[in-house]
Swiss-Prot record:
Protein name (database record): C-type lectin domain family 4 member K
One GO CC term, this protein: plasma membrane
Taxonomic source organism: Mus musculus
Tissue-level expression: Expressed by Langerhans cells. Expressed in dendritic cells and by scattered cells in lymph nodes and spleen. Also detected in some non-lymphoid tissues such as lung, liver and heart.
Topology within the bilayer: Single-pass type II membrane protein
Pfam family, one: Lectin_C
Coiled-coil regions, chain positions: 106-197
Length: 331
């Protein structure tokens, strides 16, 4: 390569390394070829020291000017950082407190809902109580009015009691008259029934009707005739009845309802009246019943006397007496 080209490509700046510091400055114009190498070297050193001194002075000046400001800024930054840290701590504390307060607010909302529900229930109860109170007041007014009426009636009680006593006495009299009227009506009805039966040929005695036949029949035929008239051959249950019968028979034999079953049987009344054997002893003709010929199983009234009963064959034909109890009918 030609020397001229190498000169053109030579570096146009110089630098030195001093304890890790690098200094760079522009290349001085190429020394004249007439300077000796010994003179060029000290000159370069002086320039380098001069530049270095300028750099140091500039650095010191800059530090003197900007260091206080920089330190102030650093202190401000530290202060701001400390303040921010305090605020962050405060914010963390506030966040925790906020969470606590939020929980309290939630609890308060729940309590508020409970209170609102309770308040609604209380209001409903108050309305119900007001309604009940109104009803009670209305009833109280009615009771007050009724009490006034009671007071008014209380003053009339003595008079009403006297009227009630009079009415009770009058009612007793009316009841007595009504009972008497009913008895009279019963007697009239009884008299009417008796007259009707008498008109049909019956006789009345002590609550019974008696029919004295005009046609003689056997004992069995006579009983069938009585049954057709809702009666039976007569029974005798007292001495007064015995006297009535034999007097009405007037000494003419009449069949009565006393019979027995066979020669060894007991006497009985066909109308189911209980037969009093001891009492009947006073009504038999002396020596009767004798069951003459072992065929006398039916009794008749034979004579006009208290002792008028006689036993005879049931196939004999006699007049007869039917007996029918009087039963009052209601219309």
């Amino acid at each position: 390569m030609p020397e001229a080209e190498m000169k053109e490509e030579a570096p146009e700046a110089h630098f030195t390394v001093d304890k890790q510091n690098i200094s760079l400055w522009p290349r001085e114009p190429p020394p004249k070829q007439d300077l000796s190498p010994v003179l060029r070297k000290p000159l370069c050193i002086c320039v380098a020291f001069t530049c270095l001194a300028l750099v140091l002075v500039t650095s010191i000046v800059l530090q003197a000017v900007f260091y206080p400001r920089l330190m102030g800024k650093i202190l401000d930054v530290k202060s701001d950082a400390q303040m921010l840290k305090g605020r962050v701590d405060n914010i963390s504390t506030l966040g925790s407190d906020l969470k606590t307060e939020r929980g309290r607010v939630d609890d308060a909302e729940v309590q508020m809902q409970i209170v609102n529900t309770t308040l609604k229930r209380v209001r409903s109860q108050i309305l119900s109580l007001e309604t009940s109170m109104k009803i009670a007041n209305d009833q109280l007014q009615i009771l007050t009015m009724s009490w006034g009426e009671v007071d008014s009636l209380s003053a009339k009680i003595p008079e009403l009691k006297r009227d009630l006593d009079k009415a009770s006495a009058l009612n007793t009299k009316v009841q007595g008259l009504q009972n008497s009227l009913e008895n009279v009506n019963k007697l009239l009805k009884q008299q009417s029934d008796i007259l009707e039966m008498v008109a049909r040929g019956w006789k009345y005695f002590s609550g019974n009707f008696y029919y004295f036949s005009r046609t003689p029949k056997t004992w069995y035929s006579a009983e069938q005739f009585c049954i057709s008239r809702k009666a039976h051959l007569t029974s005798v249950s007292s001495e007064s009845e015995q006297k009535f019968l034999y007097k009405a028979a007037d000494g003419i034999p009449h069949w009565i309802g006393l019979t027995k079953a066979g020669s060894e049987g007991d006497w009985y009344w066909v109308d189911q009246t209980s037969f009093n054997k001891e009492q009947s002893r006073r009504f038999w003709i002396p020596g009767e019943p004798n069951n003459a010929g072992n065929n006398e199983h039916c009794a008749n009234i034979r004579v006009s006397a208290l002792k008028c009963w006689n036993d005879g064959p049931c196939d004999n034909t006699f007049l007869f007496i039917c007996k029918r109890p009087y039963v009052q009918t209601t219309e």
